[in-house]
Amino acid sequence: MAELTISSDEIRSAIANYTSSYSAEASREEVGVVISAADGIAQVSGLPSVMANELLEFPSGVIGVAQNLDTDRIGVVVLGNYEILKEGDEVKRTGEVLSIPVGEKFLGRVINPLGQPIDGLGAIEAEEQRVLELQAPSVLQRQPVEEPMQTGIKAIDAMTPIGRGQRQLIIGDRKTGKTAVCIDTILNQKANWESGDKSKQVRCIYVAVGQKGSTIAAVRQTLEEHGALEYTTIVAAPASDSAGFKWLAPFAGAALGQHWMYQGNHVLVIYDDLTKQAEAYRAISLLLRRPPGREAYPGDVFYLHSRLLERAAKLSDDMGAGSMTALPIIETKANDVSAFIPTNVISITDGQVFLESDLFNQGVRPAINVGVSVSRVGGAAQTKGMKKVSGSLRLDLAAYRDLEAFATFASDLDAASKAQLDRGARLVELLKQAENAPQSVEHQIVSIWLAGNGHFDTVPVEDIRRFEFDLIDHLHAAVPQVFEQIAGGAQLSEESQAALVAATEDFKRTFQTTDGTPVINEPEVAALSADQVKKNTISVKK
């Protein structure tokens, strides 16, 4: 009988091979259960290790954001159709915080706050994912705002200038032209985009919060018709969306803008409007049973807007010198700028443009109240030429408003006051602009300089806008070198000023006013009296 031998090495090797190839089918996974779901909020039990703002996955692919982390339950903001959720549904952790895809291919597209396309043009190829709650640049990563962000609107570029990296609030009652001002600013970037110069190009993001779907479609159509959609992305959270989408939409726009800013590009982000975002956040907070404060807003509503708007910056040269300019819109009620949300955002931003319903109804459009509007960046964000010609414009208009109120009750005015009233009325008319018709900075400087120096004083008020439009065309043909000089960043030289005056006087001789009165002051010739005329007798020889 053969002797049985046992090799310990063979046994050890066999066990090692078996254990290395073995894979356990069981795995550990945290699972929660839906307790209730209503009004866009789900209460979930379980998930003891969940993080704040972590994404949670519900059945049917619906996702939510963990907000309230209580000891026995979690308050979740549902991003999607909450009506399909029911009690007892399983909830899983994803281990991820909310982020959106970003990239160059998002230009020209309409997306929702999750970065998903909603324009029916197919999927978008993303470069990377970017977290929505991204930290704003630190103090050392910034530099002062000094580059102008031209809006194409004379009243803003001259008196409340906006710089790249600035946060300028657009505030006013409903239907006063707030969105129109921002859309004109986007349209005015077309020439810079077509130049192909990265230092001039501005990528635009329009964030629509709580707007009607038809309004968002109209904005998209306007941008497309004017050739501005190719450098613009629309982030849409219409009124039909849940409060969660309206709350996150501005952060999605900021995340996309920061992606381009950190690449060294210039970005313009328009938040239309933050009042509706605050109302959506208030609704979420009340449904989550957080303690209400003033006007039922939660205590951190100031932080909601400050952490969003602080992400706008002009980066230092070491960081690539990119910029992100923010134009938040706030809607007031009865021109009350002292309400809770308006005062919050005014204190966060670097200035405000106040649009007044009374001016709008009087036909002054854009209806900018220059007395209340201010830019804390000021002349640092203006070209040299604009800074020089617009220096006295605000004072002239303020003096005109005071004198206009006084003249209502005064019967007689001296010649100087009457002249100031006449010029003020022409300046107000000059600052009016049609919608979707932004003007280049060269046109603005020439028009404001000529009007401020009295060259529009003889033009009837009702003809000012037509006179300006036709005059600019004439000056382009007569003195093109002046526009080239201004476009290069220089001030108006004495030679250029003389050339402008001469060309303007030539144009006045051919301009036809509505009532037929001449617009050039020809020297008056007094008629001779009868005794001054020497009578000669003419004799005719037959």
UniProtKB/Swiss-Prot annotation:
MF-aspect GO terms: ADP binding; ATP binding; proton-transporting ATP synthase activity, rotational mechanism
Translocase in keyword set: yes
Main location: membrane
Binding site for ATP: 172-179
Membrane-protein topology: Peripheral membrane protein
Site (Required for activity): 373
Enzymatic class: translocase
InterPro entries, per database record: ATP_synth_asu-like_sf, ATP_synth_asu_C, ATP_synth_asu_C_sf, ATP_synth_F1_a_nt-bd_dom, ATP_synth_F1_asu, ATPase_a/bsu_AS, ATPase_F1/V1/A1_a/bsu_N, ATPase_F1/V1/A1_a/bsu_N_sf
Domain of life: Bacteria
Catalytic activity line of the entry: ATP + H2O + 4 H(+)(in) = ADP + phosphate + 5 H(+)(out)
Compartments in which it is found: Cell membrane
Enzyme Commission number(s) of this protein: 7.1.2.2
Alphabetical UniProt keywords: ATP synthesis, ATP-binding, Cell membrane, CF(1), Hydrogen ion transport, Ion transport, Membrane, Nucleotide-binding, Translocase, Transport
Gene Ontology, cellular component aspect: plasma membrane; proton-transporting ATP synthase complex
Subunit structure: F-type ATPases have 2 components, CF(1) - the catalytic core - and CF(0) - the membrane proton channel. CF(1) has five subunits: alpha(3), beta(3), gamma(1), delta(1), epsilon(1). CF(0) has three main subunits: a(1), b(2) and c(9-12). The alpha and beta chains form an alternating ring which encloses part of the gamma chain. CF(1) is attached to CF(0) by a central stalk formed by the gamma and epsilon chains, while a peripheral stalk is formed by the delta and b chains.
Family: Belongs to the ATPase alpha/beta chains family.
Protein name: ATP synthase subunit alpha
Species, as recorded: Corynebacterium diphtheriae (strain ATCC 700971 / NCTC 13129 / Biotype gravis)
Gene, per the UniProt record: atpA
